[in-house]
Amino acid sequence: MTFKIISDSSCDLDKKTLDNLDLEIFKINCVDEEGQDLSEDMSNKEIYKKMREGFFFKTSQITFYEYLKKFEKFAEEGTDIICLTLSSGLSGTYQNACMAKKEIEEKYDIRVEIVDSLAASVGFGQITYFAGLAAKNGATYDEVLDLLKFLVEKTKHIFTVYDLKYLYEGGRVSRTKAKISNVLNILPILEVDEEGRIYLSEIVRGKNKSYKKMMEMMDEKTSSDGSDRVFPVYADDIKVLDPLIKKLEDRGYDKFLSLEVGHTIAAHVGPDIFGLAYLSENIPEKFKKYLDWLILKLKIHKKLGSHATSFFNVLNFYNLMLF
């Protein structure tokens, strides 16, 4: 690879996958109320447990200076850069990366492309993974950019939060809305729009209806024949995926990579979340020669039996109005 792909830990790919794909990753810190970074020392499960005990966590944003320092490292080596960022509709990291790109290009004769994923969580992870895999398998700089254009446009997300107390405790919904929603078992179905912003798409009562609604929404928005994998996601309760996997199988999907939500999203919405990411169209044939390893070093799951490690992260719910 004559260029470097840079992303950040909000894509939530596990360390083994990152190492295999030779991706450069910015670390987003997850700090407790005392400012201590716990993302290195605690597993997702341990952080979920702390949250249920009443602890709160915050996440950081990658600064202009951090991007500049990282870019300079590769610029000094003469290495071209493709930098993927969390959606500009959710975070200021894209703007910070663009400012750093401008300064680097004034000093060094290298190519720097900043790609706004317009995605969050598993969608961002999916984009990062396929781009890294293509580069690992010999795709050129321009071919990876071409693939990224497709992935950014076709990546879709559907998810729900089934306990709003964490959104309330984080100041993102009112006490009244959280109480009413939990008492009446009302679940918000959330998606990410074309500008990379999270929005309330539907409201349903109960998990069973949420599974059905997610499938209906997916059916409306995809022309995929099911040959590309779907990425179901969960946090603290893996059992929530059983009905989701079954409904996907009933629709002809048989390739799944079940993913654990990372701690960064949990800092904003809590551990009570599930959903999926998918492509609205099949991956074009011209890219598939670079994606023959699909799910590098990981298993394709036909049944919900074993689950790959974390791949999914960061939904910034600031200013999100659920109702």
Map each language-model feature to its residues.
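A glycine-rich beta-strand to alpha-helix segment
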Residues: T85, E113-I114
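N-terminal glycine-rich phosphate/adenylate-binding segment common to multiple enzyme folds
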Residues: E66-A97
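Mixed-charge interfacial surface used for oligomerization/domain docking
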Residues: S10-E24, N29-V31, L90-T93, A97-K102, ...
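N-terminal glycine-rich anion-binding loop in soluble enzyme alpha/beta folds
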Residues: F3-I62, E66
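Short beta-strand/turn micro-motifs composed of small residues
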Residues: S7, T85, Y234
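Positively charged N-terminal leader segments that act as targeting/secretion signals
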Residues: K299-N316, L322
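Generic beta-sheet signal
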Residues: F3, T79-C83, D228-V230
